[in-house]
Structures are given as structure tokens and as C-alpha cells.
Regions:
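Conserved alpha/beta-hydrolase "acid-adjacent" motif
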Residues: 14-19, 23-33, 92-95
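Residues at the C-termini of beta-strands that transition into short coil/loop
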Residues: 9, 32, 86
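Flexible "cap/lid" loop of the alpha/beta hydrolase fold
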Residues: 1-4, 20
Length: 133
């Protein structure tokens, strides 16, 4: 049964690499990159329409633009969404880390992004697929 797919990912994530780590050099397990994974699910669900929306950073504390990719079809309910946070690390958008509060965490995770709330975007996506009963 097809399932909807939602992903938010920083392009400079040094924990879960955007381009993947098939050879498991990072020790987190082998995995494909986001471009291949998103395309796999779009193809698997026969999603023949897509759009790319560029969202310029408007936050004061970050300069991370967002590229929103949406794949869908008029023939089925499934969709695939990807929020690509440009130059961002392993962080949850809407959550901010100030470097002076925790320099080590800021170094590894990035400063965050306040242009979107990941929690709100996740809910907006998945509430479309709720069924009655």
C-alpha cells in the first residue's frame, strides 16, 4: 500500500548526510542520499506532477533559504514532500540554538532555521491523510 512521505533535511547535515552514506563511513548505517530517496518514492507512487518553491530566508538569526519540493498525482492521494534547508545542519526548523548558549551543540547541529516551523509543516502534511472512523 502506498504511503505518504515527508522529509525535512539540511544540506550541510553532518550527522545524517544529505547525499547519503552508502559505504557507512560515518558509522550510522548505510543509507541513500535524499535526492535518490525522494525520487524513488515519487516514482514508486507514480507521482507525475511536481513543483519547486524557493523560500528566501527572512529570519534574523539564519541565512538558510528553503527549497520545498512537492510531488503528487491527480490519480491518487499520495504525496511526497521535501523541505531542503540550504546550508543547514541537523536541526529542527523552528527551534533555535544560540552559539553562546551551547557552542559545541551549535557547532554540530547548526544555528537552526526560523522561517518555518517543522512541527506545523508535519501536521499540515499528515492531516491530509487522516481517515474518518
Amino acid at each position: 500500500k502506498p504511503i505518504p512521505v515527508f522529509e525535512i533535511h539540511g544540506t550541510n547535515d553532518n550527522i545524517s548526510l544529505f547525499q547519503g552514506d552508502i559505504e557507512n563511513k560515518g558509522g550510522w548505517g548505510s543509507y541513500y542520499g535524499l535526492p535518490e530517496t525522494i525520487q524513488f518514492w515519487a516514482d514508486k507512487h507514480n507521482l507525475d506532477k511536481n513543483e519547486y518553491i524557493y523560500i528566501a530566508s527572512k529570519g534574523e538569526g539564519d541565512q538558510n533559504d528553503i527549497i520545498f519540493e512537492r510531488y503528487w498525482s491527480e490519480d491518487n492521494i499520495n504525496e511526497v514532500w521535501l523541505y531542503k534547508i540550504v546550508d543547514a545542519g541537523h536541526i529542527w526548523p523552528g527551534f533555535r540554538i544560540r552559539w553562546w548558549q551551547n557552542p559545541l551543540l551549535w557547532y554540530y547541529m547548526g544555528s537552526g532555521n526560523d522561517d518555518i516551523s517543522a512541527s506545523e509543516e508535519v501536521w499540515k502534511f499528515f492531516k491530509q491523510f487522516l481517515s474518518e472512523g
